């Protein structure tokens, strides 16, 4: 007699289910659109602004010059890029420790462009239910063909303009526009289409999948949270047990909590999660479920805040908002803020006070020390002088370190604006005036 065992197979992979976010109005949604406008005005507008006769912000990789408003940076100024990356990392740590994934929910490019593409989709195809009906309709439907075609045209237009603007930060945008109109540009045109394709794919189709599976921040955010971090939270003590009820029914008498189980918080979520199941790595902290729940609470006459930004310790101990905020600005956050402020001030001071001149000295390996007419000993050095200003400069070169040290030929050199020039310098001393061996030499270059 054999005993049969029931076996079941659990798949680690599940087919993707399209998320149809519902449009909602509220404070957090309005703030998201404020950030969309601010970030996109900066992104699309900055390449068109001029600083004198040049583009205000331009990363000219070919010429190895980086124009940031007034200053002109060179590869030798790599320390500023390093500092900028450190500032970004510290800012992310600070914002995450205070209020979770604020960056993800309000200013991340993936969120911003997904919001723009969803707004176009909503205007053309309709709200959530209309889009779901349209997707179920046959492709022979003239309405579906017309709306889908118009939506794709709008998406492609935004994506192409985004790609063009992005490349315009690396190639003068007016020159780039003229080249594209003539189908020239080679690699520039390739990168326009590449970035446009990435924008089109990520914001139009992949959407929440980028946040769930591709973005590493979703995975390591738990290491940056603690119990005093403000996150989107469902008040289960107040909301449970959930259930549908008449507006006239007293929920306490019916043994129900304040949650009416309308699922509106799920319908508006751009990643399609149910916040009532607790903190999940897919939550981007956008606050749309807060807007949705507050709208429902207003309609049924219940207090707002069933879903709200709160800390885990505050929810557990039923603290007031004031008590929670006092714990939010804890030593960890103040430490992040102090380091961030110190580093930002140090970078600004360094950038403002930096010398607009770069000098590299290289010993000429092709020429050895030799005795020249006049009984002098000569060594040859190559100096690269980089003019970091936007006006031509005359520089005077001098050297110190040995008695009787002279320069030949003329020690004055002209360097064009934002240009560099190699100068051959011959250093001469009277033969026998210095002991054999190496001696330190100091070059001085003055404008």
Across the structure, where does each feature detected by a protein language model lie?
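Short glycine/proline/serine/threonine-rich loop/turn segments at secondary-structure transition edges
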Residues: 431-440
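Intrinsically disordered, low-complexity Pro/Gly/Ser/Thr-rich segments with frequent PxxP/GP/PP motifs
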Residues: 405-432
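Hydrophobic alpha-helical transmembrane segments in integral membrane proteins
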Residues: 345-369
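Membrane-embedded alpha-helical bundles of multi-pass integral membrane proteins
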Residues: 1-242, 290, 303-341
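Cysteine-centered iron-sulfur cluster-binding motifs in ferredoxin-type domains/subunits
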Residues: 96-111, 202-218, 249-297
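Short acidic, flexible loop segments centered on an aromatic residue
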Residues: 390-404
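Asparagine-centered strand-capping/turn motif at beta-strand->loop junctions
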Residues: 385-389
